[in-house]
A protein has these predicted regions:
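Conformationally flexible catalytic loops at phosphate/diphosphate-handling active centers
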Residues: 11, 156, 160-217
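Glycine-rich phosphate/diphosphate-binding loops that line cofactor/substrate pockets in enzymes
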Residues: 19-29, 71-76, 158-166, 209-220, ...
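Short glycine-rich anion-binding loops that position phosphate/pyrophosphate groups of nucleotides
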Residues: 38-40, 84-88, 112-114, 175-179, ...
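Short gly/pro/ser/thr-enriched loop/turn and capping motifs at secondary-structure boundaries
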Residues: 41, 62-65, 88-90, 113-118, ...
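Thiamine diphosphate
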Residues: 41-115
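Short beta-strand segments
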Residues: 82-84, 105-112, 133, 143, ...
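Glycine-rich, anion-gripping cofactor-binding loops and their flanking helix/strand elements
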Residues: 91, 224-306, 310
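Conserved thiamine diphosphate
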Residues: 124-168
Length: 311
């Protein structure tokens, strides 16, 4: 039955749990079906303290999976299922199969033991990453020592679940080291959310206002990575925007236009912070350019690509 708890208790101190819930909230997840267990207790407890979330309970994981499936099909929004470690995850396989072929946006969240404990005769342990096989569009296991990487994996999973058609189930595995039951966080972090937008071809005018992308205020820089010589429209487009934006082009970009600056010609130690970074093309080779943006992260990063890859 659904419950709407009040804000009266602390959230888990585990950074990956907080990051997961923050990213899911940004991607529109509202309903969670919670299953019993000890390793997943800090996830379930935290869900029940957040006003934006609605918690439902089911004692059997197989039933929980199909309960969430029905909710996702009825609401056309992603629904999450939270289970503990070990064979509890395997009980979600029937619902994963059904969701995969019905293109239902389900998010299977499994708590896990630390990776070093797997295969060491510890209770309720098994290899959980990829346990749902080909019946999920994406399966990720969050690294415990790299929050930025965990955030990227979470966003990629949610984009695969709801934005990359057809929709379908994904699996997020969260290894949780001791202390498991430590609760001292007052609120969710403002985690980075990655959006996927389909835009009109460059030669077409957007049909409505929603198709227009609005740049944030501040300094915008366009960086061009490796391109194929066949992408002949790029120089023309750059010529149109060069009056308003600075353009930096790698040698591998093959963009013979005077409107572009080679990154080797820039003193990156004196470069001012950029508010919006727009990238297109493939690999960036220049080391100073990459180090600058890793140290001085822009407020927004737009990556333009045919397949909407996260970079």
């Amino acid at each position: 039955s659904p419950t709407h708890p009040k804000q009266y208790s602390m959230l888990s101190s585990n950074k990956n749990i907080l990051e997961t819930l923050s990213v899911l909230r940004q991607h529109g997840v509202h309903d969670f079906v919670l299953c019993p267990g000890s390793r997943n207790a800090p996830i379930s407890h935290s869900v029940c303290q957040i006003e934006d979330f609605c918690a439902h309970t089911a004692t059997d994981e197989r039933s929980a999976g199909f309960m969430a499936l029905g909710m996702a099909l009825a609401t056309h929004t992603p629904v999450a299922v939270v289970v503990t470690s070990g064979s509890a995850l395997a009980n979600l396989y029937p619902a994963a199969c059904e969701a995969f072929y019905q293109h239902a946006p389900l998010v299977f969240i499994s708590a896990d033991r630390p990776a070093a404990w797997i295969g060491q005769m510890d209770g309720q342990t098994m290899p959980q990453e990829g346990a749902l096989g080909k019946m999920v569009k994406m399966s990720v296991s969050l690294p415990e020592d790299n929050l930025w990487h965990a955030n990227r994996l979470l966003n990629e999973a949610m984009l695969a679940c709801k934005d990359r058609l057809p929709q379908g189930p994904v699996h997020i595995n969260i290894p949780i080291s001791e202390p498991v039951y430590k609760f001292n966080a007052k609120a969710l972090p403002d985690a980075r959310g990655i959006r996927l937008r389909n835009i009109s071809p460059w030669h077409k005018t957007p049909e409505n206002e929603q198709d227009c992308l609005v740049l944030p205020q501040g300094r915008t820089l366009i960086v061009i990575g490796q391109l194929h010589i066949t992408e002949q429209a790029v120089p023309f487009i750059l010529q149109q925007v060069s009056a308003n934006f600075r353009i930096v082009a790698e040698n591998l970009s093959k963009t013979p236009t005077p409107d572009c600056t080679n990154p080797c010609q820039i003193d990156w130690t004196r470069m001012k912070r950029v508010d919006c970074l727009i990238t297109l093309g493939g690999h960036i080779v220049n080391k100073e350019l990459k180090e600058f943006f890793r140290k001085h992260r822009p407020k927004e990063h737009w990556h333009v690509s045919p397949d909407g890859a996260v970079a």
